[in-house]
Regions:
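Long, basic N-terminal domains or extensions that often function
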Residues: 1-247
Length: 247
C-alpha cells in the first residue's frame, strides 16, 4: 500500500468556492476508487486559495481480484440437435475472447444457461490513477469557471501546476498541456518558488518551510490567535477574544 497526494495549483480561487471543492474532490475520489475496486484508507482534503489538495492513505497497489460470471444464451439456444455449439454460443464465446468449450452450463431461475466463469486479476493502481485524477479535474464544478489560452476545458481559475504522487512515483496526468510532477509551490509573497515533494510527510514539511498553511482549520486558528494577540497588545482596547464565523 502507498499514500497518494494530489494537488491542483491555480491562480487565486474565491474563498467561498474552496469548501465545496474539497468535498467534491473527496466524494469523487471515493466513488471512483469504489467503482474500480481500489481499496484505500482515510481520505483528506484541504487547500488554500492557490491549491486544492487530496491526500489518501494506504491505497492498494492494485485492484481487488474478482470472479466474473457472465451469463450467455440459454442451453436450448446454445446447442443444436446434434449437441454441437450453435452460432449463438460461438458468438458469445468469441465476444468474451474464449472458446465455446470454456463455457459452463448453470441453473438459473429461468432455466439452464451457458455462463463464462473466470478470475479477473486486478490492474495496477499506478496505471489507473491517471484517469481517476484526470477525471476529477474535469468534473469539479464551481459557481463560475473560465477558459484561458487555447484550452478547450474550463476551470475555476487557470491551473499553474499539478502535483500527483503515488508513493514516490509520479502519476502520469496531463491536463491541457500541464504534466503532473513532484513539484509544488510556496507562498505567493513570502516564498514564491517551487520545491520537490517526495512523500506526504515531505509535502507538509516543505509547505511549512515555504510559509504555506494548507489545513483550513489550522489556518483559522492561527488567524484567531494573531487577532487576539493584537487586541491584547493594544492598551487602548478593552480585552476580549475574537470569534471566527465558520460559515
Amino acid at each position: 500500500m502507498r499514500d497518494l497526494i494530489f494537488e491542483i495549483g491555480t491562480e487565486e480561487i474565491p474563498a467561498g468556492y474552496l469548501e465545496p471543492a474539497y468535498a467534491q474532490m473527496r466524494d469523487k475520489f471515493t466513488q471512483k476508487a469504489k467503482d474500480l475496486r481500489i481499496a484505500h484508507g482515510a481520505v483528506k482534503v484541504m487547500g488554500t486559495p492557490r491549491r486544492l489538495t487530496l491526500i489518501v492513505s494506504d491505497v492498494a497497489e492494485s485492484q481487488e481480484d474478482i470472479k466474473e460470471e457472465l451469463l450467455g444464451p440459454s442451453k436450448k439456444a446454445a446447442y443444436d440437435a446434434n449437441g454441437n455449439f450453435t452460432k449463438a454460443a460461438e458468438g458469445f464465446a468469441r465476444s468474451k475472447g474464449v472458446a465455446p468449450s470454456d463455457l459452463k452450463v448453470v441453473n438459473t431461475p429461468k432455466g439452464e444457461y451457458l455462463m463464462l466463469i473466470r478470475e479477473v486479476v486486478g490492474q495496477g493502481s499506478l496505471g489507473l490513477l491517471p484517469d481517476v485524477l484526470g477525471e476529477i479535474i474535469k468534473e469539479l464544478s464551481f459557481p463560475k469557471s473560465m477558459r484561458w489560452g487555447a484550452n478547450s476545458l474550463s476551470f475555476v481559475r487557470p491551473i499553474q501546476w499539478i502535483l500527483a504522487l503515488f508513493g514516490s512515483d509520479i502519476v502520469a496526468i496531463e491536463h491541457e498541456g500541464i504534466k503532473a510532477s513532484n513539484l509544488s509551490s510556496g507562498h505567493r509573497f513570502h516564498a514564491n518558488n517551487t520545491f520537490v515533494v517526495e512523500s506526504v510527510a515531505s509535502y507538509f514539511e516543505q509547505l511549512e518551510k515555504h510559509k504555506v498553511v494548507v489545513d483550513p482549520k489550522v489556518r483559522r486558528e492561527l488567524v484567531v490567535q494573531e487577532i487576539n494577540a493584537a487586541l491584547q497588545a493594544n492598551t487602548d482596547l478593552v480585552g476580549g477574544t475574537v470569534a471566527v464565523d465558520e460559515a
